[in-house]
Amino acid sequence: MNDFYVGYVPKMPPGLRVFVRRVVAIIGLLAMAVAAALLLGQMPFAKSTFEFGQVRSFEGILETNPYPTLLVDRPGETESNPKYSRYLLVAPGKHGADTLFQNTNGKRVRLKGELIYRADQTMIEVEPASIRALESVEPNPAPFRSLGEVHVTGEIVDSKCYLGVMNPGMGKAHRDCASRCISGGIPPLFVTRTGDQFLLVDPDGRPFPGDALRKFVAEPISVQGELLERGDSKFLKIDLAQLY
């Protein structure tokens, strides 16, 4: 009965005190081990950025096909480097920018917006009221250059969230958001297992209809298609019947 503890007694019996201390220490160590395992199991945040609230001014040539893109003059042009930096354009929220740039293809425009970027891909979330089309009309943009057929495995994401608005901007947890963004006109992006990024277009080189890609978003898929290049942007021309 020496180790029987009564709550109002000032001190716990020695034997019981040692036992309780050991149990508490073991529980504490287990809790720290579980916390460390959960921390190590988390995916690291991607090095992507959305300059929310930092509005900048831009001027360049507008290219609307297949996705609205601003071509900004690049200093130090050489034979091995493209003449322009290419910035994808999107509207605020889960909306593409197609309706913002009707009848302005090939024109030089001024606009304001916030940068979104990841790796070598850059996007601008445009302030609709800031768009100003200038009088000068530039020559037609460079044609697509075929890089041949490729077979790739990866995931379809919405480019806006993936490039920086959300982190992470891919995976099952982001599926519903990505589906709504793509349905709203945000350019769909195919990200391979090695991190390559290709804008998706249909067999005719045009954007897919709103919900055409919904069931494939955030799923691990493989596809074969023609890889195209225009400037420093790459496009993957695919047939949905060949996705698996």
Task: Put a short name on every predicted segment.
Residues M1-Y244:
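OB-fold and OB-like single-stranded nucleic-acid-recognition modules
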